[in-house]
Amino acid sequence: MHARNGWVQGYNAQAVTTGEQVIVAAELTQHTNDLQQLRPMLAATAATLMAAGIPQRPGTLLADCGYWSIANLTEIPDAPQLLIPPAKHGRQGKPRKDGNPSASRSDGLRAAMTAKLASADGKALYALRRQTIEPVFGQIKDVRGARRFLRRGLAACEAEWKLLCGTHNLLKLWRHTRSRPAPTPLAA
């Protein structure tokens, strides 16, 4: 991956979770940003749900500002409701001779998404990101100590990432079933 000071042997881990922090799609890429990852992650999520026999598509997708692009908002067919905050940095248009910034193609989309996120429903939905995807990465990195990949090469590291995500789901399932009271045996 390209970094500030040259090139590093690094990867960009992607994951999609449910509201209960169950990982439904996981991928590893060598792209330095998330701009091109929304479409593949939506496809991986749809494939996982279809393989599990769940015909229902996701209703809302919450993503961070790294996924913000005109293409991600307009060119994905059958996309769920997207809540992606506009990028905080980047070109806002070159100043015109009269001093006002020129209008860019994304100004209307940016204003619409900002309004959607500023609404009460938008704020409530987007706040769920803090309790769905962020804890998953925190649990994998900090609690389980998986801050670096142990193997080399994209294929090997992708297998390791998917193994980490699978064991995360198994731990969720184990903790969920362990917290339930044991069924009482029937009298004979």
Regions found by a protein language model. Name each.
Residues 1-188:
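Anion-binding and metal-coordination hotspots
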